[in-house]
């Protein structure tokens, strides 16, 4: 009952415009619609400041170091249990907030936050391959695009430096399952990645413009980011590797040491409104987890090949869990070697 009263109190403040504070959001770069923030500020009177990060590990390390001043963070699902176990997140009980009724039922009882006691959906998507079809006309639904690159693409490949995504794709390419500790599979993964890297131009995050301008021709990227590339260059296509590819969800969480706790809870409730979730998707070009948001979405998102997974490739997409620490250590060793 205490949780219900607290949530009701926060919502009453929001409705009455009684906030006079601020909200500090720590989120992935180029991932937050300015229109969403403007709407939230107009409705609540809360001044929002956004700080960017480029990886889950960067965000986790920054917050663990302390003195950050952030209220909200948006981790990927595989990292949420880590944030919770480290005691970094507040149990804000989104399941008792007014707009929780809008959450799509399939996103409620998730492995990383059963019943949604800590987090609310921000965006969900896939990690696959991006190819400029002007320079390559072969099969793009394969991780061989970056793991055994065709001659035409060598030297023009960029791989996002997100260990979880790249390792899962390489493991599934060799017939393994996410979070495997099979030494034979991991030996093949290590050799394949090291050999493939000589054909990559880089391992960077902020590459949307480089793909659009054709400085890059292929690589590993997220579906929404690739969608935004295609809007600038129609030759760009997104592939779903038939060997397997990661599914993921980023969620809004409130930090336990947030100075603006009520404001942060109000933001969690705010993004569960369908029209607000649609604003997030409109900008970032990913799906969200809020039922009814489709009615407010741009028309081109409803049929986009980066959003609508081909029927024959749906079954090979996997939501991988949080790997055991010992397994994660094996992956980290491979990843560290790849950075040399």
Predicted regions and their residues:
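Ligand-binding "clamshell"
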Residues: 84-91, 113-116, 228-240, 302-305
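A ligand-binding cleft/hinge motif common to bilobed small-molecule-binding domains
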Residues: 79-82, 212, 217-235
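Mature extracytoplasmic/periplasmic domains
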Residues: 255-315
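Conserved C-terminal helix/tail region of periplasmic/extracytoplasmic solute-binding proteins
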Residues: 209, 311-340
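Periplasmic-binding protein-like
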Residues: 102, 186-194, 232-256
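Extracytoplasmic ligand-binding site segments that recognize negatively charged/polar headgroups
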Residues: 69, 74-215
């Amino acid at each position: 009952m205490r949780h219900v009263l607290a949530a009701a109190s926060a919502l009453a403040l929001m409705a009455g415009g009684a906030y006079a504070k601020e909200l500090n959001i720590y989120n992935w770069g180029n991932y937050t619609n300015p229109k969403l923030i403007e709407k939230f500020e107009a409705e609540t009177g809360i001044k929002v400041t956004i700080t960017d990060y480029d990886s889950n590990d960067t965000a986790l390390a920054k917050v663990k170091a302390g003195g950050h001043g952030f209220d909200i963070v948006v981790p990927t699902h595989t990292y949420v249990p880590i944030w919770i176990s480290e005691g970094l997140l507040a149990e804000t009980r989104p399941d008792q907030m007014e707009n929780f009724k809008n959450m799509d039922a399939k996103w409620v009882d998730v492995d990383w936050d059963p019943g949604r006691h800590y987090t609310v959906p921000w965006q969900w998507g896939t990690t696959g391959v991006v190819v400029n079809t002007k320079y390559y006309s072969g099969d793009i639904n394969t991780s061989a695009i970056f793991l055994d690159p065709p001659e035409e693409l060598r030297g023009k490949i960029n791989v996002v430096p997100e260990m979880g995504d790249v390792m899962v794709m390489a493991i599934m390419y060799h017939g393994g399952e996410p979070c495997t500790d099979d030494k034979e599979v991991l030996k093949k993964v290590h050799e394949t990645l090291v050999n493939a890297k000589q054909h990559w131009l880089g391992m960077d995050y902020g590459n949307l413009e480089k793909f659009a301008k054709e400085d890059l021709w292929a690589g590993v990227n997220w579906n929404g980011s690739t969608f935004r590339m295609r809007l600038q260059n129609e030759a760009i296509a997104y592939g779903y590797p038939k060997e397997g590819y990661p599914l993921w969800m980023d969620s809004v969480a409130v930090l336990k040491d947030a100075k603006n706790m009520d404001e942060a809870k109000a933001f969690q409730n705010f993004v569960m409104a369908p029209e607000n979730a649609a604003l997030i998707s409109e900008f970032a070009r990913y799906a969200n987890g809020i039922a009814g948001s489709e009615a407010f979405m741009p028309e081109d998102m409803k049929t986009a090949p980066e959003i609508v997974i081909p029927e024959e490739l749906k079954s090979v997409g996997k939501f991988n869990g949080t790997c055991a620490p010992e397994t994660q250590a094996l992956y980290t060793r491979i990843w560290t070697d790849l950075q040399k």
